Amino acid sequence: MLNADNGTYDSWYWAHPPMYMPQNCNLEDVAHIKNFVDIPVVCAGRMEPDVAAEAIAAGKIDGMGVARQFLADPQWITKMIEDRIEDIKPCICCHSGCFNFSSSKGHYNTQDLKDTMGLARCAINAETMQSKKHYIEKAKKAKKIAIIGGGIGGMEAALVCAKRGHKVTLYEKSHQLGGVFIAAAAPSFKEKDRDLIAWYRRELTKYPSIEVKLNCEVKNIEDCKADEIIIATGARANRIPVPGVEKTIQAVDYLMGNQEVGENVTIIGGGLTGCEIAYELFLQGKKPTIVEMQDDLITTPGICLANTSFLRDFFEANKVPVHLETGVRAIEDDGVTVKGKDGVEFKIASDNVILSVGYKPMPLEHNEKDKHIHVIGDANKVGNLRTVIWGAWDVAMKL
C-alpha cells in the first residue's frame, strides 16, 4: 500500500497542510499516482470524508489517510457512523499541539525542547496524550462557579466544570460567545475555526448545569455570588507611540469587518495575526505590505514551522513586500513613513494601515490574594489557543 502525500523537509507544509492550504490539497496528485501502480493508494492531507468517499467510489484512490482529526476527537468515526456530525470537534490544522516545532531566522528550534518532544498532543483537546495530566474526575463537592468571559477559555472551563458536577454561570458582555476567537476565525481560510466556535456553542447547550448570560457585563466581581470565580476576559490590543497612530485600523476591527480597506494596505506587525491578514488580503486581490521590527516574520515560539514556513514562502513566491528590521516613524493619510535597517527613511504609499502589534492581558479588577478567584487564558498571559484551552483545564480540574 502507498500512503501518499506531498512535501519534503524543505516544504514541510505539504506533508502537514496548515489551515492556509485548501481541503483535499493532495488528492489530484495522489490520484495521478494510482494510474501507475497496481497496489492500493491512500491519500492524506486535509481530506474531507465526503470528498474522499466520492474519490474512492470513482476509483481515483483506495483510502483516506487521517491523523490530526483523531487527536482532536478520537470518537469522530463513531460519531460519523451514528450520524452525529455536529458532535465532532473539528481539527483546525493549527499544529500547536501535534507538531510543536517552531523556527525563525537563525534558530533551528525556538520551542522549548521538552515541549517539542511532546508530539501527538492536541491544542483543542487537552486530554489527548495527556491522560495523566488532564482528565475528568467528579468533584468531591459540587460548587457554584462563575465564569466571566465567553471566549474559548471561558467556554472550555465551563464544560470541564460541568462535567465534574459543578453548577456554572457563564457571563458574556457581548451578544455572542466566542470572544476574540471570532475575529481570529474570520479569514476565508479559517472555516474550521468557525466550525469550532459553533461546536462550543452547541456543546454548552447539552449541560443543564451551565447557564449562559449574554449581553451581561460584570463590572464588579463582588456581584458574582459564587463559590469560585474564573476570570476569562481576554486581552486588549497594543498601540505604538508614533504620530498618526489614530489613523490605523486595529487588526481585530478589520477582521470583524468593522472597517473596509482599499487596494494598498500596510500591516504594521509581522506576527502570526499580521501575516494571516496579509495572506487574506492577497487572496482578495489586494496589495498588502508587511512592516516588522524583528529580523524575521512570526518569531514567537509555539507556532509550528509548517504554518510559518508556508506563509514566508507564499509571500516570497508572490512578491508580497516584507520590510524586516524596519521601524515605523509616522503614519499619514496617504501612507507610512518607516526607517529601514540601513537607517534610511522611506514612505510606503497606503490606502489603509492595519495595526497588529500584539496584546496585553485585560483581567477584570479583583483581589489577587483571593484564592477563590482564578485568572485564565489571555487575561492571565497572552498565548495561543493551546495555552488558553490547556490552561482552562489546569484551573477547572482543581475546583
Question: What do these predicted ranges mean?
Answer:
Residues 167-206, 280-326:
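Rossmann-like dinucleotide-binding cores of NAD(P)H-dependent redox enzymes
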Residues 213-224, 236, 324-335:
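A conserved short coil-to-beta-strand element within the FAD-binding core of flavoproteins
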Residues 226-228, 232-238, 254, 350-362:
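Glycine-/small-residue-rich beta->alpha transition segments that form the dinucleotide
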Residues 1-148, 152, 156-168, 176, ...:
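Flavin-dependent oxidoreductase catalytic cores
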Residues 277, 300-307, 376-399:
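A conserved FAD-binding loop/helix module that cradles the flavin
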